[in-house]
Amino acid sequence: DVPASIDWREYGYVTEVKD
């Protein structure tokens, strides 16, 4: 599970909500 609350700008990539 990927937390939708993750700020992808902090990580440098887009995190989509996947199960």
UniProtKB/Swiss-Prot annotation:
Entry annotated with the keyword Glycosyltransferase: no
Domain of life: Eukaryota
UniProt KW keywords: Disulfide bond, Hydrolase, Lysosome, Protease, Thiol protease
GO cellular component, one term: lysosome
EC number: 3.4.22.15
Gene Ontology molecular-function annotations: cysteine-type endopeptidase activity
Recorded catalytic activity of this chain's protein: Specificity close to that of papain. As compared to cathepsin B, cathepsin L exhibits higher activity toward protein substrates, but has little activity on Z-Arg-Arg-NHMec, and no peptidyl-dipeptidase activity
A GO BP annotation: proteolysis
Cystine residue pairs: none
EC supergroup of this enzyme: hydrolase
Localization (cell): Lysosome
Keyword Signal: no
Role summary: Thiol protease.
Complexes and interactors: Dimer of a heavy and a light chain linked by disulfide bonds.
Name the record gives this protein: Putative cathepsin L3
Biological source species: Fasciola hepatica
